[in-house]
């Protein structure tokens, strides 16, 4: 039987540390971080995320600003807003809410964010620095996954890890972070043959495929750490990539959906912001 990893608890512990850091700065009369969010249109998921981000910032003591732009805004106007924020010395982090409207060039717009304010770690410059092993901002979900694995107190070093999915935001960066922790990592994707046999050898499985209940009990090695990044709606219920109830019987540790990785990601964003001042 697995231990369910409580992402909310991991997030709360991180937020306490960050609040202590901000409280110390306030006591010393030092500048408090400010993050500016840009929302284009009115995507419901983004609106929920912004509400949650604002709450976390308020709890920690960080200034949060939200800029809302019309969905049909011209690309040049968005870039102008970003460049103004780049120049603003009182803004220390910029979040561009995804997804952008399909009419916009996402890569072009993202790369207008100053790398030193790109706390989401999405710009090409931060990506290049990350894979070269240089100091930079790292995508928050990938960072959160490592934080969750470490919360189990199990060593990552020397372990076999399988990452299901190769996205630039989750799959690839979490694989690199696991390598940095001295794990031996295999990345699986839609063209990988016999994913099950690869998973059965893994001490750590991170699934970010977006296929509901793809990972079954017979994929799992006894005692494995299973991290579910997937998010789907099945029969009106929110589910992940892992067949949770059955995998729970065999894994050592497992994250639920909801209440797992998604609870930690927003806090990692604020941790990145605070790193600017360290």
From Swiss-Prot:
The molecular function terms in GO held by this entry are:
methenyltetrahydrofolate cyclohydrolase activity; methylenetetrahydrofolate dehydrogenase (NADP+) activity
Q: Carries keyword Oxidoreductase? A: yes
Question: Its pathway?
Answer: One-carbon metabolism; tetrahydrofolate interconversion
Is DNA repair tagged as a keyword? no
Q: What is the name of the protein in this document?
A: Bifunctional protein FolD
> Which Pfam families does this chain map to?
THF_DHG_CYH, THF_DHG_CYH_C
Question: What gene, per UniProt, encodes this protein?
Answer: folD
Share what the entry says about its subunit structure, partners included.
Answer: Homodimer.
Q: Where does NADP(+) bind?
A: 165-167, 190
Native species: Clostridium tetani (strain Massachusetts / E88)
Q: Under which EC number(s) is this enzyme classified?
A: 1.5.1.5, 3.5.4.9
Say which domain of life the source belongs to.
Bacteria
Free-text function comment from the UniProt entry: Catalyzes the oxidation of 5,10-methylenetetrahydrofolate to 5,10-methenyltetrahydrofolate and then the hydrolysis of 5,10-methenyltetrahydrofolate to 10-formyltetrahydrofolate.
Instruction: Write out the GO cellular component annotations.
Output: cytosol
Q: Which reaction does it catalyse?
A: (6R)-5,10-methylene-5,6,7,8-tetrahydrofolate + NADP(+) = (6R)-5,10-methenyltetrahydrofolate + NADPH; (6R)-5,10-methenyltetrahydrofolate + H2O = (6R)-10-formyltetrahydrofolate + H(+)
InterPro entries in the record, alphabetically? Answer: Aminoacid_DH-like_N_sf (IPR046346), NAD(P)-bd_dom_sf (IPR036291), THF_DH/CycHdrlase (IPR000672), THF_DH/CycHdrlase_cat_dom (IPR020630), THF_DH/CycHdrlase_CS (IPR020867), THF_DH/CycHdrlase_NAD-bd_dom (IPR020631)
Q: Which UniProt keywords apply?
A: Amino-acid biosynthesis, Histidine biosynthesis, Hydrolase, Methionine biosynthesis, Multifunctional enzyme, NADP, One-carbon metabolism, Oxidoreductase, Purine biosynthesis
What NCBIfam families would the database entry show?
PRK14172.1
């Amino acid at each position: 039987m697995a231990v369910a990893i409580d992402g909310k608890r991991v997030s709360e512990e991180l937020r306490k540390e960050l609040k202590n850091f901000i409280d110390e700065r306030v006591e010393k009369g030092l500048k408090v971080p400010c993050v500016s969010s840009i929302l284009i249109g009115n995507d419901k998921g983004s609106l929920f995320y912004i509400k949650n981000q604002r709450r976390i910032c308020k709890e920690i003591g960080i200034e949060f600003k939200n800029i809302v732009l019309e969905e049909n805004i011209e690309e040049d106007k968005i870039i102008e807003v970003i460049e103004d924020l780049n120049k603003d010395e009182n803004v220390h982090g910029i979040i561009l809410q995804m997804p952008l409207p399909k009419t916009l060039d996402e890569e072009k717009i993202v790369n207008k964010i100053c790398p030193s304010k790109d706390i989401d770690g999405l710009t090409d410059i931060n990506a290049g620095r990350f894979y070269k092993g240089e100091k930079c901002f790292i995508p928050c979900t990938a960072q959160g996954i490592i934080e969750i694995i470490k919360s189990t107190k199990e060593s990552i070093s020397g372990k076999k890890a399988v990452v299901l999915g190769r996205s630039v935001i989750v799959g690839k960066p979490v694989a690199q972070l696991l390598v940095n922790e001295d794990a031996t990592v295999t990345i699986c994707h839609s063209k990988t043959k016999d994913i099950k046999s690869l998973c059965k050898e893994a001490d750590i499985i991170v699934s970010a495929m977006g296929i509901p209940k793809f990972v079954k009990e017979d994929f799992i090695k006894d005692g494995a750490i299973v991290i579910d990044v997937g998010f789907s709606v099945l029969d009106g219920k929110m589910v992940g990539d892992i067949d949770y109830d059955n995998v729970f019987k065999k894994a050592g540790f497992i994250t639920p959906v909801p209440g797992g990785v998604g609870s930690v990601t927003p806090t990692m964003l604020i941790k990145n912001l605070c790193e600017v001042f360290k």
